[in-house]
């Protein structure tokens, strides 16, 4: 009942109006899994490769017809009659068929869409939710927890057309007792921020991830406005709400000058200076998490930052680790960062993603499951966060259905499992001393 009978791939549109790959996996017994691949804007250089057509006559060269053809003509043949419940076997067949380190032959976007669709079809054949099937693949059957959200309310950097250099300013509702309550708190603060921006005559347009994207004088002004917005609600910054930022510092780094340039403020920092700039921000505001606070290749800078901030702040490696267990192991050995951001399409299969999560947990690193700036309505990351008890999720703001689809799935899962079987640990999930 779980043998793959056919795979159909197609080109669909993501949240930025760019093409991406969707795969439909059919099993004996009529079970079907449907999944699509997301796409990033600020990407790590060691991420698995996203295959694009490069045909300027279609979608400005961003079409994915090649990837679709490779699924329909090669991957589908290689996987026909294979058991969809053997996720590792399925993924390794595709990895071997590709034969490259970075999945450049078949494309991570092609491989991932099939990998996730296989998992969904297998879950359907077992008549269980995706999160429960993922827990079984992860060898943690029946073990679940609900993640604390990182809710992006101001977008900057490559995620918005504005002058803010830090890419994401996020809130974490630490006083919430359930994920549903944390989402409600996030919504209330999001709307309070929107009203405040209107009062100040600022733009309330949103960026790629649904957060507001106003032009501001500095990164500190963004933090001040968030602080003011929270004061308009019944919540207290520091007590109910903590802050998180994603610097995406690789996008700020000039390799020739070895400087981090904040163009919006017209200031530059050396590696150590940038760490101390972030340290001052975290002393002035209740920032509990800093993502990619150095360039991905500046491991000495990351090591220094970890020595300075690692005992107080959650230091998250995104471009640094690219969901790659081998790179993560090197970072763990060197004592770099204390948490990892998990993005399925950085590595390209569900199996390798689960391996990265296991590696992080074994080293007591924090785990944050993440979306990409180019998303679809696929809500698999919600199930992934629950099925691996990852503890935190980062999936954008409280606008744009490509973001809210994940929050809504978390609400459904929590309702289905109840707090007894899927506890919400809140602040305890953050690798921070606060």
Swiss-Prot record:
Catalyzed reactions per annotation: (2R)-2-phosphoglycerate = phosphoenolpyruvate + H2O
Top-rank taxon, per record: Bacteria
EC number(s) on file: 4.2.1.11
Cofactor(s) the record lists: Mg(2+)
Coiled-coil region: none
Co-factor binding comment: Binds a second Mg(2+) ion via substrate during catalysis.
Subcellular location: Cytoplasm; Secreted; Cell surface
Binding site for Mg(2+): 246, 291, 318
UniProt-listed InterPro entries: Enolase, Enolase-like_C_sf, Enolase-like_N, Enolase_C, Enolase_CS, Enolase_N
Entry's Gene Ontology BP terms: glycolytic process
UniProt subunit comment: Component of the RNA degradosome, a multiprotein complex involved in RNA processing and mRNA degradation.
Described function: Catalyzes the reversible conversion of 2-phosphoglycerate (2-PG) into phosphoenolpyruvate (PEP). It is essential for the degradation of carbohydrates via glycolysis.
Entry's family note: Belongs to the enolase family.
Name of the molecule in the record: Enolase
Species whose genome carries this gene: Buchnera aphidicola subsp. Acyrthosiphon pisum (strain APS) (Acyrthosiphon pisum symbiotic bacterium)
Gene name in the database record: eno
């Amino acid at each position: 009942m779980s043998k793959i009978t056919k795979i159909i791939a197609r080109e669909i549109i993501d949240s930025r109006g760019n093409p991406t790959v969707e795969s439909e996996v059919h099993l004996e017994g009529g079970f079907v899994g449907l999944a699509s691949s997301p796409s990033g804007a600020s990407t790590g250089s060691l991420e698995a490769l996203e295959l694009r057509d490069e045909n300027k006559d279609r979608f400005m060269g961003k079409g994915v017809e090649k990837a679709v053809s490779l699924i329909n003509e090669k991957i589908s043949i290689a996987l026909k009659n294979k058991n969809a419940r053997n996720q590792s076997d399925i993924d390794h067949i595709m990895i071997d068929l590709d034969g490259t380190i970075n999945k450049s032959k078949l494309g991570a976007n092609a491989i991932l869409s099939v990998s996730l669709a296989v998992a969904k079809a297998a879950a359907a054949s077992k008549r269980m939710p995706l999160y429960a099937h993922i827990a079984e693949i992860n060898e943690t059957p029946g073990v679940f927890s609900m993640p604390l959200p990182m809710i992006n309310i101001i977008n900057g950097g490559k995620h918005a057309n504005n002058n803010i250099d830090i890419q994401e300013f996020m809130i974490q509702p630490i006083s919430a007792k359930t994920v549903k309550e944390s989402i409600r708190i996030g919504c209330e603060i999001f709307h309070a921020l929107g009203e405040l921006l209107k009062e100040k005559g600022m733009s309330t347009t949103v960026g790629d991830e649904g957060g507001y994207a106003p032009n501001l004088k500095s990164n500190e002004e963004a933090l001040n406005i968030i602080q003011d917005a929270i004061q308009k609600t019944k919540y207290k910054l520091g007590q109910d709400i903590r802050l998180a930022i994603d610097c995406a510092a690789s996008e700020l780094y000039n390799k020739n000058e070895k400087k981090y340039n904040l163009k919006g403020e017209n200031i530059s920092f050396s590696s150590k200076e940038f760490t101390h700039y972030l340290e001052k921000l975290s002393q002035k505001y209740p920032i509990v998490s800093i993502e990619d606070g150095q360039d991905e290749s500046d491991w000495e800078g990351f090591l220094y930052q970890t020595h300075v901030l690692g005992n107080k702040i959650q230091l998250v490696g995104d471009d640094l680790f690219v969901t790659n267990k081998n790179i993560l192991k090197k970072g763990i050995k060197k004592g770099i960062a204390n948490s990892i951001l998990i993005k399925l399409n950085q590595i390209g299969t569900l199996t390798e993603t689960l391996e990265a999560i296991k590696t992080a947990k074994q080293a007591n690193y924090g785990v944050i499951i993440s979306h990409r700036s180019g998303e679809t309505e696929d809500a698999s990351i919600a199930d992934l966060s629950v099925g691996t008890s990852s503890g935190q999720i980062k999936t954008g703001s409280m606008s744009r259905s490509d973001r809210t689809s994940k929050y809504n799935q978390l609400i459904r899962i929590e309702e289905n499992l109840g707090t007894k079987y899927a506890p919400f640990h809140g602040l305890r999930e953050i690798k921070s001393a606060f």
